[in-house]
Design a protein with these regions (language model features):
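Acidic, S/T/G-rich, low-cysteine, solvent-exposed domains in lumenal/extracellular/periplasmic regions
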Residues: 1-150
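Short, aromatic-rich amphipathic segments at membrane interfaces
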Residues: 151-173
Length: 173
């Protein structure tokens, strides 16, 4: 998947949380409402069948304007162009799936990611002018997998994001 943007690697997509993700964790619904992205480099879209006994929730999807790039291989020297004739797909595709099912009286929980690099030191240490969900998702993912028993889970209502601080300084006559 690619997401061409000015001054950014096109293979790095800012995937978005789905409204359905709020059923897994209320924080994900807040992230979906605020367009809080999950940064993924080299991600692939996932497909699944729904007839294997699992409840499947598309947790995170590729952003609008991204597509499956099949022709460009040199992203530093070439500008990728969407080509549907080559079989490229321009639609939001799942990049993270949450699966659940009842098994022997217990709930089995599975997360499938279309990218492994989202949870690396390299991804966590990138300097950006916008926030990403990579770090917080790591903790919430582990908490969900452990049925919110570890780490301690204290959901809080979203705080309003309506503060703007401006300053001005002028030097000279």
């Amino acid at each position: 998947l690619i997401q061409p943007r000015k001054d950014e690697d096109p293979t790095n997509i800012n995937a978005v949380f789905t409204p359905q993700a709020g059923g897994i964790n209320p924080m994900f619904a807040q992230w979906a409402n605020r367009n809080y992205p999950l940064s993924m480099t080299g991600a692939v879209g996932l497909s699944c069948t729904m007839d294997k006994g699992y409840d499947v929730v598309p947790l995170v999807v590729s952003p609008v304007g991204s597509w499956t790039e099949l022709e460009t291989t040199d992203f530093e020297g070439e500008v990728p162009v969407f080509n549907p004739k080559a079989g490229e797909i321009n639609q939001q595709l799942p990049v993270v799936l949450a699966l659940t099912r009842q098994l022997n009286g217990k709930e089995q929980r599975i997360l499938i990611f279309g990218d492994a690099d989202w949870m690396t030191t390299g991804e966590f240490s990138k300097s950006r002018y916008y926030g990403v969900a990579n770090g917080p998702l790591t903790t919430l993912m582990c908490s969900w997998m452990a049925d919110y028993q570890y780490p301690t889970y204290f959901p809080r209502p979203a705080q309003p994001d309506n503060h703007l601080k401006l300053s001005y300084s002028h030097e000279g006559p």
